[in-house]
Amino acid sequence: MAASSAKKWWKNAIIYQIYPRTFCDSNGDNIGDIPGIISKLHYLKELGVDVIALGPIFPSPRRDSGYDTSDFKAIDPDLGTMEDLDRLISRAKRVGIKVMMDMCIASTSDEHEWFKKALEGDEKYKNYYYISAYKRNNWHGLRSRSAWNKAENGQWYLSIMGKNQPDLNWSNPDVYEDMADAMRFWLDKGIAGFRLDTMNIIYKNSMADGGFNIFVKGGEHYLYTQGCRDIIKRLNQDVWSKYKCFVIGEGTSIFPDDSKHFCEDGLDAIFFCGRIDSGSKKVQKLQARRNNKKLIKLVDKGQHTLETPINYVESGDSTTYAKYFGNDKQNCLNFSKVYTGMHLALVGIPFINDGEYCRDPKVEDDPTSLYSFTSKMIEFRKNSKALSEGVYHRVAAPYDVLIFTREAKEERLYIYCNFTPAPRQVEFYGDRIVFSTYDIGSLEPFFLKPYEFRIIASNI
């Protein structure tokens, strides 16, 4: 793994995802920036955050939210300077917070200097990409009917993620060395690790036509290839293990079984995000009912399959579930607490997505806010051996209620999650209620309240 078993500092970390452009604006230009993040370090520390995960900070034309990178060794001038980043890393370190960053390694922007030189005919950089006088196969793009796009000079280039994101040719040793060098550049500055975006499509094992594929035509030639696994292993050996950094993989159409293989190859953890489908207002109730069942199934599978799941906690204003509530802000808040509590109680690393509620200074003083709930739950998790070290077991429950235990040494906790707006009759275990989204004195003996998250402790 990227960090040796004795040095896995990230095992019990609380990670907070920040999208710099929308987090905090320090200079009044309506664009969040790195100095703005520095100004909020006290807030992040009080929340209980151990690691900041920065969204894209590289220069980019922003045709894909900044993941279309035009320089892997520079800072987007809208977000600040290299000195600002150095200051963020230094000041975060003072308060016990590490900084990691997103890095899209499958492609570049079509405005990257490498790609410009490639189209100009520079043979070295032409081999950094898949450039041809014609479409070499019938592959579909992940967002288009064809993975091939035509440049102004009449040449075709492979761009699976989109027209403006030409794929890098990782079978070229020069590409490997330049990308490994870019990682070393940031690690030498004190970056604690990376979230590698679209890492599972970096290696193409063939340029042959694609047949039927459950995800996308041609996917059998670039999704989860052995070559991709070999590159991950090599990056771990050459770079990550030497810095004891934390590396998370992210990619399209990743499921728990695939995640397990990538972690065996050198990643420390991988995003397994079971996304919830949205629907029209007419089917929202049906969708919500179906999705609660789906969510519980996905969570349970991830807990059994992955050694270190990433428990992605979407904010109350960004989660797809919020669509079901419309203007019903109270129920949206109540559900968000259950959803957040569940993720903070599961085995794995909580990855909290920045949301509007976290940028409002009023929420820090509101005991009913999601901020307050999250802060208390993080503190509870950090002080509980069962939640920080314990094993997971699911307990039988109604289809839209999740009950599971976390157990370590002399402590067993029963965690109850009611994802519905109605009371649910369940069998309660344990000796004493230690945490709830409701006032403990108001709880009923045989029912979970609507959208209730509850923890009951039991001495073993």
List PLM regions with ranges.
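Residues immediately flanking
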Residues: P20, M103, T198, G251, ...
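Short glycine-biased active-site loop of nucleotidyltransferases that positions the nucleotide triphosphate
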Residues: R62-G66, S259-C263, T405-R406, F446
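Carbohydrate-interacting/catalytic domains
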Residues: M1-A53, P59, D86, R91-A92, ...
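Conserved alpha/beta catalytic core and glycan-binding cleft of carbohydrate-active enzymes
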Residues: G96, D110-L142, I232, N236-Y357, ...
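Acidic/aromatic-lined carbohydrate-recognition and catalytic surfaces
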Residues: A2-R184, D188, I201-S259
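Secondary-structure capping and boundary motifs in well-ordered enzyme cores
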Residues: K11, G227, T305, C332-S336, ...
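Active-site regions of oxyanion-processing enzymes, predominantly non-cytosolic
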Residues: W186-L196
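Active-site rim elements
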Residues: P166-N172, Y176, E220-Y222, Y321-N334, ...
